[in-house]
Every structure is written in C-alpha cells, then in structure tokens.
UniProtKB/Swiss-Prot annotation:
Gene Ontology CC annotation, any one: plasma membrane
Subcellular location: Cell membrane
Keyword Magnesium (UniProt): no
Signal peptide: none
Protein name, entry field: Tremerogen A-10
C-alpha cells in the first residue's frame, strides 16, 4: 500500500 504519511511519497 502507499502510505501518504511516509516520506518520499509523491502521491498527488
């Protein structure tokens, strides 16, 4: 899963 709280997440 993609964790938006984790650093390095280029999630727009």
């Amino acid at each position: 899963e993609h964790d938006p709280s984790a650093p390095g997440n280029g999630y727009c």
